[in-house]
Curated annotation (Swiss-Prot):
InterPro entries: Homing_endonucl (IPR027434), Sporu_reg_WhiA_N_dom (IPR018478), Sporulation_regulator_WhiA (IPR003802), Sporulation_regulator_WhiA_C (IPR023054), WhiA_LAGLIDADG_dom (IPR039518). This is Probable cell division protein WhiA. It comes from Lacticaseibacillus paracasei (strain ATCC 334 / BCRC 17002 / CCUG 31169 / CIP 107868 / KCTC 3260 / NRRL B-441). GO terms for molecular function: DNA binding. The keyword Transmembrane does not apply.
Length: 315
C-alpha cells in the first residue's frame, strides 16, 4: 500500500502548470536533486530520484519549458534490491538551462545554492518552488497512524532559510533545525500541514488529510469524554462508599434514631439504596422530594458528624 507521502507526490506530478511556474518547480528539483559532471568538455546534468513519477515529471517539465529531450537512466540499488534509482540526464543546453533557472552563473560558472530572488518576489512562483522542493526531498507522516509531521530537507543553510521564508510567507508557522547532514524545515500542526498541501496544489491529499484529522480529533474527543465520565463515576462511587461507611459508623456507635429526623431519613435511604445517584435519592424521600443539592448537603452533614466522633478514636 502506498504511503501518504507517495500519494501526495503522485498528485503533485500530475498537475499542469504555466511555463513560468514550471521553471520555479524545476529550479527546486534541479537545485536539490541535480548534479553536474564534465564529459567531453561540456556539462552533463543528472537529476536523481527514487520515484518514477517524479522522474517523468522532471523529464516532461524540461521538454515543456526548454524543448530539450533528456535521457532516462534506471539503476537498481545493490544494497536495497527492491529500490531503483531514476536519473534524468540532460546533455544538451545544460549551461543555458541552469543559467535561466538561476542555478549557474554564466560568467563565473559558480553554482548558486540560494532560492532565486525572482521566485521570492511572486507568490505563485513560491508555491511552485515549494512543490518542487517537496518532490525533491520532502516527507509527510501518515495522518492515520503517526504524529503529525511534514518536513523538507536542504543540504545548504542558505537554501533552507529560503524554504523557511517562503513557507512562513503563507503563515505556516514553519520551524527549522540543523541535522548532522544538513537542515530541515518542518511543520507539526495538523492545520498547517493541511494548509501547506493546499499551497503546493495537493488538493485531494489535503482533503484526505483533513478527513483523517477530523475523525482522529473526534475519536480523541470521545475518548476524553469517556475518560472524564469514568473519572466522575469513580468519584461518585467513592463518595457513596464513604457515605455508607460513615452512616454505618453512626448506626453502630450513635444509633440512627438519635439523629435529627431529616438526617435519619437520608441515612436510612442511603443504606437501602447504596448504588443510586443523589438525584434519585432526592426523589425517593418519604417526607417529600428534595433537590440533588439538598441530598448532598444532608449527606455531607452526616459525614461531618461521623468524622467528629471518629477523631477522638484516631488521636
Amino acid at each position: 500500500m502506498a504511503s501518504f507521502a507517495s500519494l501526495v507526490k503522485k498528485e503533485l506530478t500530475q498537475l499542469e502548470v504555466h511555463p513560468e511556474h514550471a521553471k520555479a518547480e524545476l529550479s527546486a528539483l534541479i537545485r536539490m536533486n541535480g548534479s553536474l559532471t564534465l564529459m567531453a568538455h561540456r556539462f552533463v546534468l543528472n537529476i536523481q530520484t527514487e520515484n518514477p513519477a517524479i522522474a517523468r515529471r522532471i523529464y516532461s517539465l524540461i521538454r515543456q519549458v526548454y524543448h530539450h529531450e533528456a535521457n532516462l537512466v534506471v539503476h537498481r540499488k545493490m544494497k536495497l534490491k527492491k529500490n531503483y534509482q531514476y536519473i534524468v540526464r540532460l546533455t544538451e543546453g545544460v549551461n543555458d538551462i541552469l543559467s535561466d533557472l538561476s542555478i549557474l552563473d554564466p560568467d563565473t560558472m559558480a553554482i548558486s545554492t540560494t532560492v532565486p530572488a525572482s521566485v521570492l518576489k511572486e507568490p505563485q512562483r513560491m508555491r511552485s518552488y515549494l512543490r518542487g522542493a517537496f518532490l525533491a526531498s520532502g516527507s509527510v507522516n501518515n495522518p492515520e497512524t503517526s504524529r503529525y509531521h511534514l518536513e523538507i530537507y536542504s543540504l545548504y543553510d542558505n537554501h533552507n532559510a529560503g524554504i523557511l521564508k517562503m513557507m512562513n510567507h503563507f503563515n505556516l508557522n514553519a520551524r527549522t533545525v540543523e541535522r548532522r547532514s544538513g537542515y530541515i524545515v518542518y511543520l507539526k500542526e495538523a492545520e498547517k500541514i493541511a494548509d501547506f498541501l493546499q499551497v503546493i496544489g495537493a488538493t485531494n491529499a489535503m482533503l484526505k488529510f483533513e478527513d483523517v484529522r477530523i475523525m482522529r480529533d473526534m475519536r480523541n474527543s470521545v475518548n476524553r469524554l469517556v475518560n472524564c465520565e469514568n473519572a466522575n463515576m469513580n468519584k461518585t462511587i467513592d463518595a457513596a462508599q464513604k457515605q455508607i461507611e460513615n452512616i454505618n459508623y453512626l448506626k453502630n456507635h450513635v444509633g440512627l434514631d438519635n439523629l435529627p429526623a431529616k438526617l435519619r431519613e437520608i441515612a436510612v435511604l442511603r443504606l437501602a439504596h447504596p448504588d443510586v445517584s443523589l438525584q434519585e435519592l432526592g426523589a425517593m424521600m418519604p417526607s417529600g422530594q428534595i433537590s440533588k443539592s439538598g441530598v448532598n448537603h444532608r449527606l455531607r452533614k452526616l459525614n461531618q458528624i461521623a468524622e467528629g466522633y471518629q477523631q477522638p478514636e484516631d488521636a
